Amino acid sequence: MKNKLDLSLYLVATKGSKSEECFLNTLENAIKGGVSIIQLREKELNAREFYKLGLKVQKLCKSYKIPFLINDRVDIALALDADGVHLGQEDLEAKLARKLLGDEKIIGLSLKKLEQLEFIQGVNYLGCGAIKATPTKESSLLSLELLSQICDKSPIGVVAIGGIDKEALVELKGINLSGVAVVRAIMDAKDAFLAAKELKRKIYENLSLK
């Protein structure tokens, strides 16, 4: 799977205050609109709740044949036999996650500095941002210049994340990205299908999808 990874429209999904039914409907509509990969990110759920929700999201992703990743929690990814995991710089090292998950699973890594490219052994793609201020990352912005440098030097695909919407995609034109990751642009949209469809159109218009 990692050799044919479509990162073009990457959804980071958090249930938040939505009902489970509404959450799963949002994800299904987003997939129908063009989402190519889903990462389940649940910081507020305990392990059992995360696992139970993960089972349902995994079933949905399997039915549409798109990859399903878990944020941070290698243990949950293992328990679910998810397609992979996305790690932050303070999570378990990628090489250890690779040892636990095996060669066929997808491992993504958050990255903000050029020098961190030295430590991406065993990683399939990079997530870089935030591109714009978000409620959780107001003080950790990544300049477009640095993002471009990381993309040019990275031997693996790079996904931009953080405050990305239709307008931001125009600003990313010319940068060698493999895709963009969104949260609120789809999860908070009135119509997840239309939001995803419009984002996908803008992605194809503006990104080379390296």
Curated annotation (Swiss-Prot):
GO molecular function, one term: thiamine-phosphate diphosphorylase activity
Cofactor(s) of this protein: Mg(2+)
Record GO biological process: thiamine biosynthetic process; thiamine diphosphate biosynthetic process
Metabolic or biological pathway, per its Swiss-Prot or TrEMBL entry: Cofactor biosynthesis; thiamine diphosphate biosynthesis; thiamine phosphate from 4-amino-2-methyl-5-diphosphomethylpyrimidine and 4-methyl-5-(2-phosphoethyl)-thiazole: step 1/1
Coiled coil: none
Cofactor note: Binds 1 Mg(2+) ion per subunit.
Keywords recorded for this protein, A-Z: Magnesium, Metal-binding, Thiamine biosynthesis, Transferase
Entry EC no(s): 2.5.1.3
Ligand binding (4-amino-2-methyl-5-(diphosphooxymethyl)pyrimidine): 39-43, 71, 110, 137
Residues reported to bind Mg(2+): 72, 91
Catalytic activity: 2-[(2R,5Z)-2-carboxy-4-methylthiazol-5(2H)-ylidene]ethyl phosphate + 4-amino-2-methyl-5-(diphosphooxymethyl)pyrimidine + 2 H(+) = thiamine phosphate + CO2 + diphosphate; 2-(2-carboxy-4-methylthiazol-5-yl)ethyl phosphate + 4-amino-2-methyl-5-(diphosphooxymethyl)pyrimidine + 2 H(+) = thiamine phosphate + CO2 + diphosphate; 4-methyl-5-(2-phosphooxyethyl)-thiazole + 4-amino-2-methyl-5-(diphosphooxymethyl)pyrimidine + H(+) = thiamine phosphate + diphosphate
Domain of life where this protein originates: Bacteria
Annotated 2-[(2R,5Z)-2-carboxy-4-methylthiazol-5(2H)-ylidene]ethyl phosphate binding sites: 134-136, 163
Span of the signal peptide: none
A GO CC annotation given for this chain: cytoplasm
Record flagged with keyword Transferase: yes
Summary of the function given for this chain in its UniProt record: Condenses 4-methyl-5-(beta-hydroxyethyl)thiazole monophosphate (THZ-P) and 2-methyl-4-amino-5-hydroxymethyl pyrimidine pyrophosphate (HMP-PP) to form thiamine monophosphate (TMP).
Family per similarity comment: Belongs to the thiamine-phosphate synthase family.
Name used for this protein in its record: Thiamine-phosphate synthase
Natural source organism: Campylobacter jejuni subsp. jejuni serotype O:2 (strain ATCC 700819 / NCTC 11168)
Organism lineage string: Bacteria, Pseudomonadati, Campylobacterota, Epsilonproteobacteria, Campylobacterales
